[in-house]
Regions:
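Long, charged amphipathic helices and adjacent flexible linkers at domain junctions
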Residues: 83-91, 167-180, 213-239, 295, ...
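C-terminal cap/substrate-recognition subdomain and adjoining C-terminal extension
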Residues: 236-354, 358-396
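Conserved active-site and cofactor/substrate-binding residues in soluble primary-metabolism enzymes
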Residues: 16, 20, 24, 59, ...
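Short glycine/serine/threonine-rich phosphate/pyrophosphate-binding segments
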Residues: 21, 113, 190-193, 345-348
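Short hydrophobic segments within beta-strands
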Residues: 14, 103, 183-185, 272, ...
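Active-site neighborhood of HAD-like aspartate-dependent phosphohydrolases
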Residues: 178-224, 228
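A conserved regulatory-domain signal marking ACT and ACT-like small-molecule sensing domains
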Residues: 1-179
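Active-site pocket-lining segments that scaffold enzyme catalytic pockets across diverse folds
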Residues: 146, 187, 256
Length: 396
């Protein structure tokens, strides 16, 4: 494709924001034979910066400049212009754009400098920067062209670890904003507790459950062996403890906001848990989540049998659930998001289009595409490109 040369004017307006500025500027340009090629506007701390690129007849340059300066005087703003012969074909929409989202509770200049440096080192160019959230976390989104996602991801992972910030990279295009399936772990992700620990406390066996958990972490037991051993310690507990434990569960801050916002935007929310359907079913009803899988406790004659009934929901089963729920909703696996914190979540995090480690163990963070270290589950929304204005914060 050949170059297209045109005489252009780049207009930069800055000043205190107030109603009517944009209207006045374009009214000043309206009498001339002008084509608008590009326009950008941002307001930060009540300061407006408006840039406009126009194509114009070179003979009209002085008249346009005079009218623009008169407009600036009326509005009490500054207007600077740059006129030049420009290859406007290079201004067309770029392919292969990447969205780089930086998430942190406190954004420092050094972190931004290193993010920008990593983008440059990956042969990327920053096309735009937008703040999508300011409190309780800060989210900044960079639109990047020219960089290879794999190379950029590798360099930014070092920046994230160095500065203790969270960074996610996603390609631009329709896939980023299509219907998604978001699958969540439960214990220490959707809720703040570990359900098996709550049940063990009712049996006075908390210390024994902890010993089994530590043995599993040392690799001496796999998840199924560990789960069955821990559930066996619950044998003889009255069925009524399930309701007691349900009353002790608290949602992770931002969990309700996350689920409600995703539902309102047309996405599907699913849940998988190494815990128990007996305990989490009322919570699923409360959150209006119909797609969920968890283990089932054996109950006979009003007591826990100390057994797990049916299929064990281990890491492989969690990944399979992701595929199954996606197929049921006719959602491509590339449009899925998996969120979890433990080793049992690794397979689903690897299988998903975007795997997110939430306040996770180091091995899980290393395996995930992105991570969230802030204590708010709804921070995940920013990694999905959903701005603060679209989020139901009244539910937090």
């Amino acid at each position: 494709m050949g170059t297209i040369e045109q005489f252009t004017g780049l207009i930069l307006l800055s000043g205190v924001d107030k109603p009517g500025i944009t209207q006045e500027l374009f009214s000043a340009l309206a009498p001339f034979s002008i084509a608008i090629i590009d326009i950008e506007q941002v307001v930060i701390s009540n300061r407006l910066i408006l840039t406009v690129l126009i194509a114009l007849n070179p003979a009209h340059e002085k008249a346009i400049e005079d009218d623009l300066q008169a407009c600036a005087a009326r509005l009490d703003v500054d207007i600077a212009t740059l006129y030049a012969q420009t290859n406007i074909s290079s201004i067309s929409t770029k392919a292969g754009l990447l969205h780089v989202v930086v998430l942190t509770t406190k954004l420092l200049p050094e972190a931004v400098a290193n993010v920008a440096g990593a983008i440059a080192d990956a042969d990327g160019n920053i096309e735009g920067v937008t703040r999508t959230a300011s409190a309780p976390v800060t989210a900044i989104e960079f639109l990047v062209s020219g960089a290879k996602q794999e190379a950029l991801s590798a360099s930014l992972s070092v920046v994230a670890a160095t500065h203790g910030i969270d960074i996610a990279i996603q390609p631009s295009g329709n896939l980023r904003f299509g219907k998604k399936l978001i699958q969540l772990d439960v214990d220490s992700t959707l809720i703040e507790q570990e359900v098996i620990d709550l049940l063990a406390a009712k049996a006075g066996k908390g210390h024994l459950v902890q010993e089994i958990t530590e043995s599993a972490m040392r690799g001496e037991l796999d998840f199924e062996q560990s789960l069955r051993a821990r559930v066996l310690l619950l044998k003889g507990l009255p069925e009524s403890v399930i309701k007691e434990v349900q009353g002790e569960i608290t949602l992770t801050p931002g969990a309700k906001t996350l689920v409600q916002t995703l539902h309102r935007l047309g996405h599907v929310v699913a849940v998988v848990s190494g815990g128990f359907t007996d305990v989490i079913s009322p919570l699923m009803n409360e959150l209006q989540i119909t797609s969920f899988r968890a283990n089932k406790l054996g109950i006979e004659n009003g007591e826990l049998t100390g057994e797990v009934v049916g299929l064990i929901i281990d890491r492989a089963a969690k990944a399979q659930a992701l595929h199954d729920f996606a197929a049921e909703e006719s959602i491509d696996i590339s449009q899925t998001v998996a969120i979890g914190d433990g080793a049992n979540d690794l397979d689903m995090i690897a299988a998903a289009g975007l795997g997110i480690a939430f306040n996770a163990k180091p091995a899980v963070k290393a395996a995930a595409d992105s991570s969230v270290s802030a204590p708010y589950l709804d921070s995940v929304l920013y990694l999905l490109g959903i701005p603060r204005e679209a989020i139901d914060f009244d539910l937090r």
